């Protein structure tokens, strides 16, 4: 059973790439044609890559791998949080802070600080502080929740990063590669497929395209962790 159909991808606008002048030649094998100055992605290739990605992610989840979803641009932010939470994964959807992976010890301390402030807020301890001090603590809490809220349950660096928009998330890519963390990446026509282990060529700007891909990857994680055999991604060859 196919993970996604051509009709679903067409409806989501997954085939629209960038203007031809903005392309990366390494993506040529995933491009069907150019139309009105815009590259059109070969959705047959995308379907194959989605099947491969589904099986790869499902297998990784089954073996206990931990996932981090990353996508900080406006179109991706809400979907990234929604799908990561649905499959019990961590996420970054506002801003990638330098050292989130490569300086994990410091980042973990900031996450612990966030948890402490949340406990203080829920217990009423902040409300009992002098007004000015309480306001400072609440501002700190809001800032930490915004940038680190999706990492509260991440006890160590992830095994896999699921990425939306490789070009925008350059720092996340560099940190993951430095630590040999596997990358599952949505790749638009301006991206470099050599920088990830699991490529998914598709439109990484359209909300519906992002939703389609991430929802299937979340399904794969849930299936790998909790069992169930719906046959997605399987080709009948075991």
Swiss-Prot record:
Keyword Ribonucleoprotein appears in the UniProt entry: yes
Pfam family, one: Ribosomal_S2
The keyword Magnesium appears for this protein: no
A Gene Ontology biological process term: translation
One CC-aspect GO term: cytosolic small ribosomal subunit
Entry's Gene Ontology molecular function annotations: structural constituent of ribosome
Keywords assigned by UniProt, alphabetized: Ribonucleoprotein, Ribosomal protein
CDD domains: RPS2 (cd01425)
Entry superkingdom: Bacteria
Classification via SUPFAM superfamilies: Ribosomal protein S2
Record InterPro entries: Ribosomal_uS2 (IPR001865), Ribosomal_uS2_bac/mit/plastid (IPR005706), Ribosomal_uS2_CS (IPR018130), Ribosomal_uS2_flav_dom_sf (IPR023591)
PANTHER family associated with the record: 30S RIBOSOMAL PROTEIN S2 PROKARYOTIC AND ORGANELLAR (PTHR12534), SMALL RIBOSOMAL SUBUNIT PROTEIN US2M (PTHR12534:SF0)
Alphabetized NCBIfam families for the sequence: rpsB_bact
Family the entry assigns: Belongs to the universal ribosomal protein uS2 family.
Name of the protein described by the UniProt record: Small ribosomal subunit protein uS2
């Amino acid at each position: 059973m196919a993970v996604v159909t051509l009709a679903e991808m067409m409806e989501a606008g997954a085939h629209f790439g960038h203007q031809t002048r903005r392309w990366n030649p390494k993506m040529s094998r995933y491009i069907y044609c150019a139309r009105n100055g815009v590259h059109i992605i070969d959705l047959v290739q995308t379907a194959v890559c989605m099947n491969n990605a589904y099986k790869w992610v499902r297998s990784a989840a089954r073996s206990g791998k931990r996932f981090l979803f990353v996508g900080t641009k406006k179109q991706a932010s809400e979907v990234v949080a929604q799908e990561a939470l649905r499959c019990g994964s961590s996420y970054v959807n506002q801003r990638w802070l330098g050292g989130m992976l490569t300086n994990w010890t410091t980042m973990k301390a900031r996450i612990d600080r966030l948890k402490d402030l949340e406990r203080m807020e829920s217990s009423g301890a902040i409300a009992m502080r002098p007004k000015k001090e309480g306001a400072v603590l609440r501002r700190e809490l809001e800032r930490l929740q915004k940038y680190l809220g999706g990492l509260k349950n991440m006890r160590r660096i992830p095994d896999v990063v699921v990425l939306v928009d490789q070009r925008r998330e350059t720092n996340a890519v560099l940190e993951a590669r430095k630590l040999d963390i596997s990358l599952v990446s949505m790749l638009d026509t301006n991206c470099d497929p050599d920088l990830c282990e699991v490529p998914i060529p598709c439109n990484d700007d359209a909300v519906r395209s992002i939703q389609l891909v991430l929802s299937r990857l979340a399904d794969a994680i849930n299936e790998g962790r909790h069992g169930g055999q719906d046959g997605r991604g399987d080709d009948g060859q075991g």
